[in-house]
Amino acid sequence: VPVQNSEIAQIFNEVADLLEIEGANQFRIRAYRNAARTIEGYPNRLYEMIESGEPLDEISGIGEDLAQKIEEIVETGNLVFLEELRSRIPPSLIKLLNIS
């Protein structure tokens, strides 16, 4: 089953949440949030664009780095960067923040 835009957006939102917990640069956090919003509302399926070789970084708000991450998600079903963030933040803290 191909990865849907909504799933990619969800991953980018989680990355933004975890970066926020870590106190990362606000511009970086905003880039992930804006990309998630753009992807969520984007009319074309990103996996189809990748399959046909269309460049993702031509989408407003999606730079080369985020385009590579989208390709990784579509091709592998997950994002190594997200796994790294999850491993650095205690699950209990994530759970606590999800409740509030």
Region spans (language model):
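Short, positively charged, Gly/Tyr-enriched micro-motifs
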Residues: 100
